[in-house]
Amino acid sequence: SAEVKLYELKHGTQMSLKAASTLMANIMNGRRYMPFWVQLLLGGTDSEGSHIYSLDAAGGSIPDQFQTTGSGSPFVYGVLEDRFRENLSLTEGKKLGVRALTAAMKRDSASGDGISMCVIDSKGFQKVSPEEIEKIETTLAA
């Protein structure tokens, strides 16, 4: 956003994820009487590490180790709360994500029928290929 760019120009450094989350929460809160009916997930890495925030329509900002949103989120949370642990490898994290989303798709018709996945780390944003997701699904089904 323009506010983030302005911050970077003024301070000569990138805005932290916590500050970006607060900025977005303030924008959402400013529209509280005519809100954007969305729930946003804001995640990434900064000088303090990796972070993910859930932002609601009223401007609430909640940090956690993992976040989910949408109609299938209760099913996704069930899997994540059972299987998530600190310092998962990238491969383990992808498998856990596919397992959690597969559970939601099986139990919630509004969750759709397909998985899109990305990895956000210190190297940037990378989309996980459909072939890799299919390969993970196959190993989980076995």
Where are these regions (language model features)?
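Long, low-complexity N-terminal extensions
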Residues: 1-142
